[in-house]
Each structure stands twice: as C-alpha cells, then as structure tokens.
C-alpha cells in the first residue's frame, strides 16, 4: 500500500533533507495537486515544525506566503504539508553565473521589502533573511517572490503592540554572512535587522560575493568572529562603491533606526523605484534567468529548418560547450538544504550579466511598479518536479554558541553556495537578438507579437537544478 499522509496526500520521492527533517514531493489524491511534505522525527532534540506551522497560519493570506495544507502527526513523524514552489533566489543566482543585473535586483528588492514588511505587520521578525529563504512561485505565479522558513522567527511585540525590551549579550541567531552589525555585536534583533540583512543580500546579488566570504579560521566560532570583524571594518561606502548611491542610502537609513523604531518601508521602496525609473527600466518581470533560460532553450531545441542557412559550424548559434566549474561563494558557505536533494543542472552563461543591466526599455506608466503583479513572462519558467522547491526549510548545519530561551532554538548557520558549469552562447545570434528586442520593445505588448512569442516558447524545458 502506498504511503499516505493525513489520509489525503500521497508521499512521493525525496526532494530535500537535513538535520531538521526530510522533504518529499507529495500529491493530493483527490485533486492531483502536487505539494511539499516535510517530515520531522518526533524524537528530534529541537523540534520546530509545530512552531513553524503556527507561524505560517498566522501569515496565511499574505502575498508571497505559501499556504499550509495540513499539519499533524503520522507515526513517528511530525508532518507539514505546504505549497510546492519554484527555485530559490540562491539557485537562480547560481544559474545566472553568480551575478545579477541591476534591473533584476531592483525588481526583487521591491517584492522582498514587501514580504518583510508583511511579516513585521504580523508582529514577527524573520531573523534569517538570505537568498535560500526566498523562492519563486510556479506557473502563473512564477514571477512572484515567496518568503519561507520561519523556524527562527520571533514575536517582537505583544497584542498591545508593546515592543520587546532591548537586550545585549545575545547569541548570534541566523546566517552569519547576512547578519546585521548589531546582531554580531550581541544586540537583540528588531525590525531594522531584517532590513539590514536584506541590504547584504542585495549587494551579494550585485557584486557576486561579500567581502567577508572565504575567511579562514580554526573553528566555526573563530570564523564567525572574523566575519564580524571584517563586517565592522567595512564601511558602507566601501561595500557599495561602484554601485548607485541608493544602496548606501538604504544601509545608512537602516543603521539610523533605533531599536524599537518602525521602519519607513515606503521610503525604502521609493529609493529603489526612483532608481529603477531613472535607469529607464521597464517593470516587466523579465528577470536575468528569464532571458538566459530562453537562450538556453534555443541551443537545446534549435528552430525548425528553413530554406536558408542551417545551424552548424558557421552558424551564429555555437554548440553548447561545458567549461570548468564556477568557484563557490566562499568557505564559510554551507550547501543549501535544498541542494542536497535536488540535482543541479549546468547553468548557461549567455553573456555578462552586467550587459543585461544596460538593456533599457521604455519606462512603463503601468502601476505595476508599485504592486507584485504577475505578468505573462511567467511562461518562460515552466518548472517541473525536479526544479520545484518546497516552501519549508530542510536543514541547518548549525553551531549553537551558548543557550537562549527563545522558542525557535537560535543558531548560527553558514550561508549556502553552489557551483555550476557555464555554457557560452553568442549574444548576437539572430534568434536570441530578435527575441530580446521583442522583450524590450514597446510593441511586445501587442497581441500578435505575444502570440507569436509564446508560440516560440511552447515546449521549452523548465529550469533544472
């Protein structure tokens, strides 16, 4: 008899796992809907699945928050059934050769600030803001950013909106690479710290790495101390040098906030939206991976033969050549909990992502710039089972320094990294160039162009990691 959960979900293959449980692909036997099923042994030393399920229920209904389908106990396991989502931003960062364009980073920043603001509105801090904990959706929601993993979340105010007290000598909770300065200094976290961590994530996407990655030390505690020292000694100006001043302004604002201050989320979003408009970008949800995936599809599935030049040695479309693996993100990095369960596919480096940032399109007057709108570009990313991610955290290879009375078992974890191979492709391919021009041209919105364009995308294989 096939294994079932809650008498409603069929348990499928394992798609991830780690010290905090195993994640399986599941199917609703009534609707055939695919879901993610996380199992946690009831005898685990620090159970967190029940706590996490309660957090998801508090946040239910929010944009970019996955839905909980079922929670309960089956035999020796606590079980959480939740939405199945697409790849994480860490996965997509690796797919894009570990660098994202300014346009993509700004589109992500807008949604990510919204997600953090919503969590804060519900009186909780996330306390583990990192690329692995933001996933893209599937299908019609492929352009929507989801926030996951509330195992380290903490309530920062009570029902009367009384803020938790300021405290010092706290253990570092979260991921050292993205932890705020005050968190390293042992100060109780508050809303400002989630936002500062997001700033480090955005600079990581733009720069490809952060100055405190790859530091050598004898043990983990010494490594975290070195990360802290490097972070303290790196000024905001040095970190953001060579990038628009809005990023430095973002950090200065976050660090100007007092412990219990309510951040002005609208100001932070406006900073990046004004930059977006000034750069002449269009809020069309065409991310770097959207373009790279389309170009890869042209290599793996060449267009039908026409009465003219054929694809070959003299063609503008070169064959796919796999080169050496890309360097990983740093020695203090840990494999993502998802990476262990999901095989990665060689990513394609079509052209330098810096050049992607220069592709300017007419500025849209559409109010989509202020909303998390899902547009037709989701047809680029048709995820299959092997590329889907559950909306729950699977593992933390953690070192707990000291004890803490908080309910979520505070930990220091190391940030994830991946290494993929590169497939060089000509940017000047007539097929690639024409389709990119369609994306950035005002005429792309016309019905005829979109029909032709979507017809070209039929049968494109989805991202595989």
Curated annotation (Swiss-Prot):
Residues 405-428 have a biased composition (Polar residues). GO terms for molecular function: ATP binding; protein serine kinase activity; protein serine/threonine kinase activity. PROSITE patterns: PROTEIN_KINASE_ATP (PS00107), PROTEIN_KINASE_DOM (PS50011), PROTEIN_KINASE_ST (PS00108). The keyword Transferase applies. Autophosphorylated. PANTHER family: CASEIN KINASE-RELATED (PTHR11909). This is Casein kinase 1-like protein 2. The lineage of its organism: Eukaryota, Viridiplantae, Streptophyta, Embryophyta, Tracheophyta.
